[in-house]
Amino acid sequence: MEYRVERDTMGEVKVPADRYWGAQTQRSLEHFRIGAWRFRMPLEIIRAYGMLKKAAARANLELGELPEEIARAIIQAAEEVIAGKLDDHFPLVVFQTGSGTQTNMNVNEVIANRASEILGKPLGSKYVHPNDHVNRGQSSNDTFPTAMYVATVLALHQHLYPAVEGLIATFEEKARAFDGIVKVGRTHLMDAVPITLGQEVGSWAAQLRNTLAMVKEAEKGLYNLAIGGTAVGTGLNAHPRFGELVARYLAEETGLPFRVAENRFAALAAHDELVHVMGALRTLAGALMKIGNDIRWLASGPYGGIGEIFIPANEPGSSIMPGKVNPTQVEALPWVVVRVFGNDQAVAFAGSQGNFQLNVYKPVMVDAALESIKLLGDAVASFDQHLAQGIEPNLERIEEHLNKNPMLATALNKAIGYDKAAEIVKKAIKEKKSLKQAALELGYLTEEEFDRIVVPMRLAKPHENA
């Protein structure tokens, strides 16, 4: 392998000749191989950094802080970072300095060398300097949290929201299709008064819509960026208008309302906005766990379970039991939820660990958040495509359970009173008789009265046509 010599304030470092990174990235590679098999800095952060460095170069050009030739080359190189053309030049891991300095310098060095190359200068020449030019008016302490928030917002919009909204649409369509199917309601895992299958599925759509709205509301906090705060929040070495311009250019680049944080001291020292978003993601994940468990129970069987719905049989379920089919999508989804719950705890703890002017748990916080967003998006899309869209009612089983449901006696409360209705239920259960038969034998109602009062659809929709 051929090498070139790069230099930083600590001396000379050998860097692979075909890599755009420089001395500080190489030092990090040598000192931090922690979790390299898996925990590479997320490319979402790199893309966000590309947007940030492009916006910074535009701002510095407008403010007269950079020569036009240098600024234009930085912008072109940053656009290549955004497009993913330079992904192989970002090898660092999540487990590094807590401010993300090494990743910031990785981006600075790659853009500086690529910009120098664009201008016809050799790699390592520092014709475009990683600190003086690419990082002008910036610190890792304000750029990394800015990239964190931009990356997280973009991940929500690109990975999570479309998947969840697709599942909501599927459930709403199923709810309309199943609205005329009356079934047993269940509370405490016990039989309760009837509902329609459409009402049950519709409740899943509503729960997801509510929890997704919580995530979207929490997301608004991430629009407040630390950029312009530099090292401790004072804005030292940055033009007074720099942060405002960068935020404006980021908003233009993304189409999202990014702005400078009202208090940049707090924006460096704490990341409560990200903690809030993770809490909302945990709530959404909890809703998915509940819905998944409902579906797993309702589809259980084929003979020993509830079996009121059919779900797609996607693959054989057992290596020893022929013909067995398992609800695999409903099992994979809760595992993702468990992962998100764990990540929420990691982000919550890391968010509490700011000291004075800086929180130094930034990389692990954003890695956990991005993993959660992407896992949830993937799991929900898979669940929708391979399970939810294929849910169908088992009408025979639904009717069987409904006809045996003793809680239909609730309809008799107004006619004969709670105590007599309870007596009918006890007799029906004890003697394994239908509710109607027990009522007639006790003499509390005639057959005509029973049939007029106990109408399952009216119990499921008591206020329609009232």
Curated annotation (Swiss-Prot):
Pathway: Carbohydrate metabolism; tricarboxylic acid cycle; (S)-malate from fumarate: step 1/1. Its EC number is 4.2.1.2. It is an enzyme of class 4 (lyase). InterPro entries: Fum_hydII, Fumarase/histidase_N, Fumarase_C_C, Fumarate_lyase_CS, Fumarate_lyase_fam, Fumarate_lyase_N, L-Aspartase-like. It is found in: Cytoplasm. The keyword Repressor does not apply. It comes from Thermus aquaticus. The active site is at H188, S318. Substrate binds at residues 99-101, 129-132, 139-141, 187, 319, 324-326. Keywords: Cytoplasm, Lyase, Tricarboxylic acid cycle. Belongs to the class-II fumarase/aspartase family. Fumarase subfamily. Homotetramer. Its main location: cytoplasm. Disulfide bonds: none annotated. There are 2 substrate-binding sites: the catalytic A site, and the non-catalytic B site that may play a role in the transfer of substrate or product between the active site and the solvent. Alternatively, the B site may bind allosteric effectors. One of its GO terms (molecular function) is fumarate hydratase activity. One of its GO terms (cellular component) is cytoplasm. The record marks E331 as: Important for catalytic activity. One of its GO terms (biological process) is tricarboxylic acid cycle. This is Fumarate hydratase class II. Involved in the TCA cycle. Catalyzes the stereospecific interconversion of fumarate to L-malate.
